[in-house]
Amino acid sequence: MDTDPSVELEDLQGIRRRRAELRESLLAVEGALAAPAPGRVEQWTERVCAALMELSADFREHVTIAEAPDGVHARTRRSAPRLARTVDLLEREHVELAALMDRLLDLLARPGATTSEQVRDDVTRLLGRLVRHRQRGSDLMYEAWAVDIGGGD
């Protein structure tokens, strides 16, 4: 494992803080999905949409920072080139996950376009993919710098 002096305490604190924010957004979406929908589908949909919008914003911030020219991904490619394929995978996931969130938000914006059950299924799959993405990101940090960035709790 490499150590990279450019991954300093300040960087790690920021990464951990953003991970915690993303985790909170994931939990908010899960909470919105778990709320009762029968007889109050409009309010339920608004709550799910608001939580998903917040998650999308937090995820896009994560992508912007991770993929910045001086971000974790660029530093990983420089310091641990053996992990470049993992970085590439994470960046492909960024594109796929952002597009999926956009599609779900578009669907939620159209009244009657779907059912609460279908939304629950689709968004739950999204949450699972995001959780796995976070796990891969955590593994990458550990493999590159022997740093445990934690789960965000």
Describe the role of every protein-language-model region.
Residues 1-153:
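Small-residue-biased structural context
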